[in-house]
Amino acid sequence: MSACPPAGHLAAATTKRPAAPLVRDEEARVVAPVRLDFMAEPTYTVKALDESTWAAFATLVERNNGIFGGCWCMGFHDDDSRTDPVHNRAAKERRVRDGRAHAALVYEGDDCVGWCQFGAPDEVPRIKNRAAYDKGRTTSPDWRIACCYVGKGHRRQGVATAALAGALDLIAGLGGGTVEGYPEGADAVPAGFLFNGALSTYEKLGFIRDRKIGKHRWVVTRVVEPGS
């Protein structure tokens, strides 16, 4: 089993101020996702994780010790993620270059400051509280929100909300469908351990509680319409 938390690593669980709006960058597949009903600084740009944005993603991961000592956001994939950060980095890069890893990257200026990982269930099959999840499952989602991460120095500034909103817009561009997330209540779990995100962040963006699968963990769902 992986030495990484099999459930990703969301940092910015709550925000002290509203999330910033997102702007479009046509050349880099940047999205202007779910419109938020407020304006605040800073303004973030969201780009899809792919070969063109890999370097910025890798810089953020390296700046934050490989994420949990070298996970490289591999914990949700079905690969044999290990304690060796070199192995995990190479495995993640292969997935990105092969189009088998999806994420919305949040930029402030030229710097990537956070992300939200998502994918179809066969791309991100690992989730926490699996036994309880399977016991209550009646259907499978089209997409899962695996995890989000916000770099040090950028937390509690709306990055997590921008990342999740960006992921939803990318999902719309990929055909939309039913999206599941597995957040916990920010009032019950320290921000550094909210690997799947804060329940309030999801609900802010239209997710509905489906069922509880852990002491503080919920399955939440939302239908995303196909993008034009």
Label the model's feature ranges.
Residues 111-151, 155, 189-199, 203:
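Conserved acyl-donor/pantetheine-binding loop and adjacent beta-alpha core of acyl/acetyltransferases
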Residues 4, 192-205, 210-228:
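C-terminal "cap" of GNAT-fold acetyltransferases
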Residues 87-105, 121-126, 144:
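A short helix-loop-beta-strand connector motif used in the catalytic cores of GNAT acetyltransferases and
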Residues 4, 31-75:
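Conserved N-terminal entry element of GNAT/NAT acetyltransferase domains
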Residues 171-191:
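Conserved GNAT acetyl-CoA-binding A-motif
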Residues 147-150, 156-172:
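Conserved acetyl-CoA-binding loop-helix of GNAT-fold acetyltransferases
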